[in-house]
Amino acid sequence: MSSYDNHQALAGLTLGKSTDYRDTYDASLLQGVPRSLNRDPLGLHADNLPFHGADIWTLYELSWLNGKGLPQVAVGHVELPDTSVNLVESKSFKLYLNSFNQTRFASWQDVAETLTRDLSACAQGEVKVALYRLDELEGQPIAHLHGACIDDQDIEIDNYQFSTDYLQGAASGKIVEETLVSHLLKSNCLITHQPDWGSVQIQYRGAKIDREQLLRYLVSFRHHNEFHEQCVERIFNDILRFCQPESLSVYARYTRRGGLDINPWRSNGDFSPATGRLARQ
């Protein structure tokens, strides 16, 4: 359980509440959640973050009307910088996108500019938006996260409560540079406690991290309640704190919900995330 799940900043969210679905444009549907909510307990401050990164969203259910009333469809790619004041709450994002459905826009550029303006205002940061026609994405192969998968270990687990204890003494010995991947990440929505399923890629240079301890740590998120972005920052912070690598990058790709998937990454080095969708996305 997070220490801030009853914070007043969450009280006004539509998440977990019955809502009306509007199909005409309404920017007020967007709701932001302060990033400071989970960063403050971790000792992370906006003016001295130990990482850089972004939250990459894929919008699969995006439709509007053109100037003549003909429906248009697109796949959207959105990037929120980790330096934005707020993250965007996903249910509000879905409701906001639904409000485009019966709204006429003069051009695709008009749609992209509207999304950029509204999301930047909600996040209080510079958001990037790109729209893709379906024929631009047809034939796109299923991607995979590069690295050594740590999931097929013959270990017994009977505790699924979140704990950083699994990382105690996890790094020792010679300096290595490696990339590890797990598809067993499961956390739960901070408000509704619905399951969030993801794959995580951890790239680091430093003392070798024990793979069993790392996997036990990741599995301990199974009953943990936080938003996707917050989980990635927690993983980054915990590995940095306990394993003290020289460089570290953490990237998670979560399965979609409500036509949206969220793929946050954080790094203190040179890292360029692969943006192709995975098998479960």
From Swiss-Prot:
InterPro entries: GTP-CH-I_C/QueF, NADPH_dep_7-cyano-7-deazaG_red, QueF, QueF_N, QueF_type2
GO MF annotations, alphabetized: preQ1 synthase activity
Pathways per UniProt: tRNA modification; tRNA-queuosine biosynthesis
Compartments, as annotated in UniProt: Cytoplasm
Enzymatic class: oxidoreductase
Disulfide bond entries: none
Pfam families with a match to the protein in the record: QueF, QueF_N
An example Gene Ontology CC term for this record: cytoplasm
GO biological process: queuosine biosynthetic process; tRNA modification
Catalytic residues, chain numbering: C189, D196
Binding site for substrate: V88, E89, S90, H228, E229
Transmembrane segments annotated in the record for this chain: none
Main location: cytoplasm
Keyword entries, A-Z: Cytoplasm, NADP, Oxidoreductase, Queuosine biosynthesis
Residues binding NADPH: S90, K91, R257, G258
Family per similarity comment: Belongs to the GTP cyclohydrolase I family. QueF type 2 subfamily.
Described purpose of this protein according to its UniProt entry: Catalyzes the NADPH-dependent reduction of 7-cyano-7-deazaguanine (preQ0) to 7-aminomethyl-7-deazaguanine (preQ1).
NCBIfam families linked to this entry: QueF (TIGR03138)
UniProt protein name: NADPH-dependent 7-cyano-7-deazaguanine reductase
Lineage: Bacteria, Pseudomonadati, Pseudomonadota, Gammaproteobacteria, Enterobacterales
